[in-house]
Amino acid sequence: MTDSEGPSRTVLIAALVLAVGAIGVVLAIAVTRHPPLQPVAIATVPAPHAQDPPCRTLLAAVPQRLGDYQRASIVQPVPAGTAGWRAASASEPVVLRCGLDRPTDFVVGSPIQVVDQVQWFEVRQDDRSTWYTVDRPVYVALTLPPGSGPTPIQQLSELIGHTMPAVPISPTPAG
């Protein structure tokens, strides 16, 4: 082959390698790119202490990620004292509410679970659960979808332990 017959074999191989590499990069970007997270809709519930200093401090410090969940915007109007996270693979969000009233089911003798020095009371609703802190100056609720695993409650327990002092629990008298 002479120079007048076209590009050399080396140039053709280099061009082919570059083209395959460019296609590989485009495919890798397409596979790893996540669609934008949908905003989280949070119903308004009474939260008389949502503007109290402990809630403001907590909400200012919540992380952008809770395990596989990423902080998401909240549909307007945003209820006071709330934050939400979504996972690309999950349809249900993780929702945090701060400044709520004491849960009505939290009575003397209710089972409590401790996660990283924070005491939680669980309320089950269909296939999800809501956990309430019961040993802090304000009640914080964390609603977890099925399959969310322990990471969200562990990370938030650590944060709550650092941002809010512990107080004695105060369940409603039984009966």
Language-model segments: residues:
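Extracytosolic low-complexity repeat regions of secreted or lipid-anchored proteins
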Residues: 95-175
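A generic structural signal for short, non-catalytic loop/turn and secondary-structure boundary residues
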Residues: 35, 89-91, 135
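C-terminal region of N-terminal signal peptides and the immediate post-cleavage residues
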Residues: 4, 24-47
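Hydrophobic membrane-insertion alpha-helices, especially the h-region
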Residues: 12-30
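Terminal targeting segments of Actinobacterial cell-envelope proteins
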Residues: 1-8
